[in-house]
Regions:
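OB-fold nucleic-acid-binding modules
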Residues: 20-88, 92-283
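C-terminal motif of bacterial Sec signal peptides marking the signal peptidase cleavage site
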Residues: 15-18
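Positively charged n-region of N-terminal signal peptides that target proteins for export
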Residues: 1-5, 21
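Sec-dependent N-terminal signal peptides
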Residues: 6-11
């Protein structure tokens, strides 16, 4: 009798364990939880960034927007996100033909779409246009190109398995580069002297009355520094006062800069993504 009770107890424990295993079974993590995994990659629908810029050139250059009605996809790689706080409510993507901004009305994007991540964007029903002639994908806002909602972004984007920055070319920046073609690209600037460097001035300090620094937008918006003495109407280093590296002291030595070369009309604006995008040259 005792043996029978022991046998029944063992069976009961085994059944309970099996039920618990079933109840607490780990979720299927083969697909990313962020984005829309139902978007199927279709080579016949894919367009390049250069093709988009060409097809919507008037909307981009004219400061307007146009809604994309064709069933098209963009296969691209993320080259800039909001991890360092200098890129705000947008990411920058690039393919072998060009680069552009994607406006998203949300923050904390970087844990889901890191630099080097390949993504597929369903373009149908999104808008394309230009902000200061910088090509941007997003949504309509007061008759111009603006940011899309995070809900819409997740519906129109799929994260792909590939994560490889080696496929992306880093251009050696030249101030004479064609802005229509190269704006938005990941670039490298060699042997650069950053303006306002005196051993104590930081990249983007909070605004103080009497400052000689150039602030763009609100007093605590962006700080512009010249590069190699070029006119600030032609080329600036643009850093947010809210960037994680805003308090970095500007090197007084020549540096190599890595960043995103965006444009605002005729002005090149270099956006660094993290403190290590500034590398002091070895002597």
């Amino acid at each position: 009798m005792k043996a029978k009770h022991i046998f029944l107890t063992i069976i009961s424990v085994m059944m309970l364990t099996a039920c618990m295993d079933k109840e607490w079974e780990a979720p299927d993590m083969t697909e990313p939880a962020y984005g829309n995994n139902s978007i199927q990659q279709d080579a016949t629908k894919q367009v390049t960034i250069d093709q988009l810029k060409t097809a919507y050139a008037n909307a981009i250059s004219g400061g307007g927007f146009q809604r994309i009605t064709d069933d098209q996809q963009l296969l691209c790689t993320v080259i800039g996100n909001d991890i360092g706080g200098n890129i705000y409510k947008q990411i920058i993507v690039q393919d072998s033909t060009g680069a552009m901004v994607v406006g998203i009305n949300g923050t904390g994007l970087f844990p889901f779409i890191s630099v080097g991540q390949q993504i597929l964007i369903n373009l149908k029903d999104l808008c394309i246009g230009g902000y200061g002639q910088q090509a941007q994908i997003g949504d309509e806002y007061n008759g111009s190109i603006g940011r899309m909602s995070t809900k819409k972004w997740e519906e129109h984007m799929r994260i792909l398995p590939s994560h490889d920055m080696s496929q992306i070319d880093t251009l050696d920046f030249d101030i004479a580069m064609d802005k229509n073609r190269y704006a938005g690209h990941l670039v490298r600037l060699k042997d650069v002297m950053i303006g306002d460097a005196d051993g104590t001035t930081t990249l983007a300090p909070e605004y103080k009355a009497g400052t000689t620094l150039t602030y763009n937008g609100s007093t605590n918006g962006y700080v512009h520094h010249s590069l190699n003495g070029e006119s600030m109407n032609a080329l600036v280093l643009r850093t947010s006062t809210y960037a994680d590296f805003a308090s970095l002291v500007i090197p007084t030595e020549p540096v190599t800069l890595y960043g995103i070369a965006t444009r605002y009309n005729s002005t090149w604006q270099i956006l660094i993504r993290a403190a290590d995008d500034i590398k002091v040259n070895e002597k």
